[in-house]
A protein has these predicted regions:
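Acidic/His- and Gly-rich active-site-bordering loop/insert found
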Residues: 2-112, 134-138
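Predominant activation on well-ordered alpha-helical scaffold segments within soluble catalytic domains
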Residues: 21, 51, 122-129, 158, ...
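An extended, acidic, His-containing surface patch that forms the Zn2+-binding/catalytic region
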Residues: 62, 261-328, 338-350, 361-459
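Active-site metal-coordination/substrate-binding segment of hydrolases
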Residues: 79-146, 152, 164-169, 429-437, ...
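Acidic, glycine-rich active-site loops and adjacent beta-strand->loop/helix elements
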Residues: 86-88, 142-153, 174-179, 211, ...
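Acidic-glycine-rich active-site phosphate/pyrophosphate-binding loop
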Residues: 90-105, 192-198, 241-251, 357, ...
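Midchain, well-structured core segments that form catalytic/ion-binding scaffolds
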Residues: 151, 158-340
Length: 459
């Protein structure tokens, strides 16, 4: 580690914190497109704030039609990329700190996006500033990309590639874990829909739950028509309230990142398993029973596949039931499932679709992100591991994860930081936060990694 570079980064801490507060205070959840704002007003406003920060720090920026932008330092024919993103998942419920106030308490800055991924973006920006201000020689250009659609469909990077965006020779995204992520499971986001025709005394009138496909839902509710005098059973985690003509049923769970649904408690699954006990009739009964039997609260998709799909490198397939919507005429669900790095889409997707179609459901949408795997001996992986080990003294091996990052979207890129072993995992959850000491430490590691990759000989 370069002592002078580390000291220069540490001296920038007050500016880093202030910059991060500015970005966190900009809610940046994707919304319907507007003219010149493909991801909606809020995402565009946060992007504008990031570009303003760059200009205030003396960087020139490039804006690719408001889909993605970047700042850059250095010269040379080749480019090293650092890919971060400014968009966030919806805030959801259960916060003790306002999700967009960027409050600091106990050495931590709280807010949606603070760790995923605005904090790492700010750390990367000030790493570039320290390198530039010290005049450290670089044999390659270094480009910090500001992504705007990572949490949903990666349309930012897809647009970048489709419109001639330069491909890096080396790069990383600070949107994962240390020491380094050299494998990412394949990801399938799928939605399914079914029509309902209800005529009985018990009817499902409305159902809703979840905030995003890649978040374990902590709340779900349904409204039912019920015969006069009918009563509903008590159940743990379920609240029943009488309403005109029937009942409202609410279920609570525990939120978690959709790549680790086993770490949460799925409120949608709890709700549907409860509804499955009620005397619904016809299509509604069949649809609810299918969901309870084949999905329920199973975080591994074993019920859908009939077996557990797993490997030694990355563990079992995960299956997060992230969203449900419906009324008296239809139901719609969205799944986010992730298959192991040594396996293929064909090992799981056809079986999932067949199970739904056999029960009368139709595939309503699908987005697939391929798996990723780089052996530990590749130059990119070994160089970044060297930087991390020099900074921390930790010789832990690289790891495979269920999370999906920008590393899947561009070649020669892996996820590197920002989470250290033992750090609280708060992304996509209430009270998301970043430790400010970790913010500075990340900026120091990123700065040294940039210098390493920009000067790394390649055959």
């Amino acid at each position: 580690m370069d002592k002078k570079l580390n000291e220069a980064v540490a001296a920038l801490r007050p500016q880093m914190v202030a910059a991060l507060q500015r970005l966190v205070r900009r809610r940046s959840v994707e919304a319907d497109p507007l003219p010149g704002k493909p991801f909606g007003e809020e995402v565009d406003a946060c992007f504008a704030e990031a570009l303003t920060l760059c200009h205030e720090l003396g960087f020139e920026t490039t804006d690719m039609d408001r889909y993605i932008g970047w700042c850059e330092i250095g010269t040379g024919d080749e480019m090293v990329a650092v890919l971060g993103h400014l968009d966030v998942v919806p805030e959801g419920e259960g916060w003790h700190h306002p999700p967009y106030a960027a409050e600091i308490e106990g050495g931590r800055l709280y807010g949606r996006g603070s760790i995923d991924d605005k904090g790492p973006v700010v750390a990367s920006l000030f790493a570039l500033k320290a390198i530039r201000d010290l005049g450290i020689p670089l044999n390659r250009r270094v480009r910090l990309l500001f992504g705007l659609n990572e949490e949903t469909n990666d349309r930012d990077v897809l647009y970048y590639k489709a419109h001639g965006g330069e491909i890096p020779v080396l790069g990383f995204t600070p949107d994962g874990e240390y020491p380094l992520i050299n494998g990412e499971k394949g990801i399938l986001n799928e939605s399914y829909a079914v029509q309902l025709h209800q005529t009985g005394a018990w009817q499902l009138d409305r159902v809703q739950g979840g905030v995003a496909g890649n978040v374990v839902p902590d709340y779900a509710c349904a409204a039912l028509t019920a015969p006069a005098g009918a009563s509903l059973p008590d159940a743990e985690h379920i609240t029943v309230t009488a309403i005109p003509g029937g009942y409202q049923v609410e279920a609570v769970g525990v939120s978690a990142h959709g790549s680790h649904p086993e770490q949460g408690e799925n409120a949608i699954g709890r709700l549907v398993c409860y509804l499955d006990q009620l005397p619904l009739e016809g299509d509604a009964k069949q649809a609810v029973h299918f969901l309870a039997e084949k999905l329920g609260t199973d975080p591994y998709g074993e019920r859908l596949l009939g077996h557990r799909l797993e490997d030694a490198l990355s563990g079992p397939m995960s299956c997060n039931w992230g969203l449900i919507e419906g009324d008296a005429q239809h139901l719609w669900v969205k799944l986010n499932y992730r298959y192991p790095v040594t396996m293929e889409r064909a090992d799981c997707q056809p079986a999932v679709q067949t199970a739904f179609e056999a029960a009368g459901w139709a595939l309503d949408g699908q987005v697939h992100k391929e798996k990723l795997y780089y052996p530990a001996e590749t130059p990119l992986v070994s160089a970044l591991l060297e930087v991390y080990r020099d900074a921390t003294g930790d010789n832990a091996p690289p790891k495979c994860i269920g999370g999906g990052t920008y590393a899947k979207m561009l070649p020669n890129v892996v996820a590197f930081g920002p989470l250290f072993a033992g750090d609280p995992v708060t992304e996509h959850q209430p009270d998301e936060c970043i430790d400010l000491e970790r913010l500075v430490q990340n900026a120091q590691i990123i700065a040294n990694a940039i210098v390493k990759l920009a000067n790394l000989p390649l055959e």
